[in-house]
Amino acid sequence: MLKITEAEKKALKGRGLILNNDGEHFIARIVAPNGVFTNEQMQMVTDVAKKYGDGRVALTVRLTIEIQGVPYENLEPLVKEVEAAGLVTGGTGSIVRPVVACKGTVCVHGLFDTQAFAKRIYDEFFVGWHEVTLPHKFKIAVGGCPNNCVKPGLNDFGVYGQSVPEQDLNRCRNCVKCAVIERCPVHCVSRGAAGKIVVDKAACTNCGKCIAACPLHSFSEKERGYAVVIGGIWGKTQRLGTNIGGVYSEDEVMKLIEKAILLYRELGRTGERFGRTIDRVGVEEFIRQLKSDEVLSRKGDILKMAATAKGGVITVNAQISSS
């Protein structure tokens, strides 16, 4: 049995080097900026798996790769080769976790380049805020459309693409076979009393399929952006993320992520998931604070917070990378 202290185990786990249940070997978790690895990086993965592990690799839910069966003495040389390939080990702890994205970049349903946006979030918050300790893990997911393949609503902060349609009834000719009715995947389009097309806006998911369907262009795109859901939890207990309402640009989403993290650090109790913090504060009140810029005026103080009697964070003087 490997003889290392609990403090050493914790420190290694914080670097994505996790002791197995055999008490002897580790897995090494390798993180890509957006879940996408180049062929050169994949070759490196297979090489280090053979050289330093037992030759096996496993894929995780958050699109990271884990090298299996790594002896303790092989951990440091493995990490050096991973870093030389432009990747890092990690993805554990009470920090921003690896960012996941669906394949919206290449998917026929994708409304955005999700992998590029995930890379932007990764650089800013996984890398830049890596030393900012939070009450618990903080997971971010980027979805390209309302299909929600990457499950944004089960992440602490999730976004998914929106193409908001606008209807021009003057262009509608009451076609016997309406392409929009046939194309709508959620069946929120029907004929009204006068034969005109009626959209149930409450049921519409803003997938944008109707916009290209009508040959008379009776539907156009009014707005394109991201819906935002916060506080999703999937684990021992579950909580579906709360939609904060509205459609946001990438820049606006980046600012919302920053404010969400700051509010979580300020209001969360140690060991409390983000969704539980939201519920304790009150959903409406939390969303009000999130949409306001008030928390940004307290940013410096929040990043200096230590643990408090009510809970709070556990790191003093958190630093944000300028890189």
Task: For the regions a language model picked out, list residue spans one by one.
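Small-residue-enriched alpha-helical segments and adjacent helix-cap loops
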Residues: 2-4, 26-177, 202-203, 316-323
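Generic secondary-structure signature for well-ordered alpha-helical cores
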Residues: 47-54, 87, 126-130, 186-190, ...
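Iron-sulfur cluster-binding cysteine motifs and their immediate structural context
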Residues: 177-199, 209-225
